[in-house]
Regions:
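C-terminal secondary-structure termini that scaffold catalytic or DNA-interacting sites
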Residues: 105, 109, 113-121, 126-133, ...
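Short, basic (Lys/Arg/His-rich) helix/loop patches that form interaction surfaces
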Residues: 45-57, 66, 101, 109-130, ...
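Short functional hotspots where side chains directly engage DNA or cofactors
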Residues: 17-18, 85-91, 124-126, 155-158, ...
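Well-ordered beta-strand positions in beta-sheet-rich domains
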Residues: 87, 98-102
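Basic, Lys/Arg- and aromatic-enriched nucleic-acid-binding interface segment
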Residues: 7, 11-75, 84, 94-97, ...
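Surface-exposed helix-capping loop/turn segments at secondary-structure junctions
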Residues: 5-14, 150, 216-224
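Short, Lys/Arg-enriched alpha-helical recognition elements, typified by the DNA-recognition helix
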Residues: 1-4, 18-20, 144
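Alpha-helical scaffold segments in carbohydrate-active enzymes
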Residues: 1-7, 65-69, 169-170, 209
Length: 231
């Protein structure tokens, strides 16, 4: 609630901030993440009220929706995105494998809006001055500006854990679909790596389901888990 007020300029600080980190986080997590649906809803509403640049606001909206690695999102090139087919294809920096991200309707709408100011260039999220792309610290800086602690609460990379947890535990999506969309190494029953188009219809359905779920959370709906809808 206070983060939303900060984003709207109604408050200057969060009185609960000193309590952050008082409860130890679960071990084994490399990046802090928000996985409670109610807290996710507040964060998404804060993104809508972000008073930074339009380009950074678009990055904030797309980061949780697409849950790509932060470096891959900020380095996205317009030539890799087909808005008519609703697909984003690129080479994963970590594995060097080809990857395909089905773009939900909401992502296509945001990218079409973003195309007006940045579409004439190479990068979806261009940097300022001589920088080719948006800085690697931009998303985290925006989160801190909204009142989030990027050491203990959420980081740009934490959106991946957020999506994985909620897709699995709330929406009950098949784990292999989630891992494949996270661009993790997923192998078929014969031990071979899946092609980037593997399970594409199911992944398209999952990504649209995820974007719709985030919209409902943001709107304040009491979202009921859609059991098995992308299985």
């Amino acid at each position: 609630m206070f983060r939303y007020a900060i984003a709207r300029g109604k408050a200057k600080s969060d009185p609960a901030q000193p309590l952050v980190g008082a409860i130890p986080s679960a071990k084994g997590k490399n990046f802090p993440s928000i996985t409670d649906p109610a807290s996710v809803a507040g964060m998404l509403r804060a993104f809508d009220e972000f008073h930074g640049t339009f380009i950074v606001q678009c990055a904030l909206k797309l980061a949780p929706m697409l849950f790509a690695r932060p470096g891959e999102l900020r380095k996205a090139e317009w030539s890799d995105i087909d808005l008519d087919r609703a697909e984003w294809r690129y080479v994963v920096s970590k594995t060097k494998n080809d990857h395909l991200v089905p773009l939900p309707r909401q992502a296509v709408e945001t990218l079409r809006e973003l195309h007006a100011p940045t579409g004439a260039g190479r990068y979806v999220f261009p940097g300022t001055g001589s920088a080719k792309t948006m800085s690697g610290n931009t998303i985290n800086a925006a989160l801190r500006r909204l009142g989030y602690d990027t050491k203990t609460e959420i980081t740009g990379h934490g959106f991946r854990a957020m999506a994985r947890t909620i897709l699995d535990e709330v929406l009950q999506v098949r784990p292999d679909l989630i891992e494949h969309q996270l661009a993790h190494a997923v192998k078929d029953p014969n031990g071979r790596a899946y092609h980037r188009t593997a399970h594409l219809p199911e992944r398209k359905k999952m990504m649209q389901q995820w974007a719709d779920y985030l919209d409902k959370l943001k709107a304040g709906a009491d979202v009921i888990p859609l059991h098995g809808s992308a299985a």
